[in-house]
Amino acid sequence: MPALADKFAVNLKSERLRRKLSQEALAAKAGLSVSYISMLERGQRTPPLDTLESLAKALAVSPTSLLA
């Protein structure tokens, strides 16, 4: 897994858990499927920019914070 995708996966899950959200709740807030959230958190997918922005908005963080 590339370093950026690895960081994104870890940060996404960390931010979700910090907010005490289930994958289902995050998926609903971001307008995505639960299976897609799961794949992102496992580093099996890299989101396009619009999805990154949706996830950041749902988690109330900046998109760059999910990549750092």
What residues fall within each predicted segment?
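Short amphipathic helical patch at the helix-1/turn junction of helix-turn-helix
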Residues: D6, L17-R18, T46
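Recognition helix of helix-turn-helix/homeodomain-like DNA-binding domains
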Residues: G31-T46
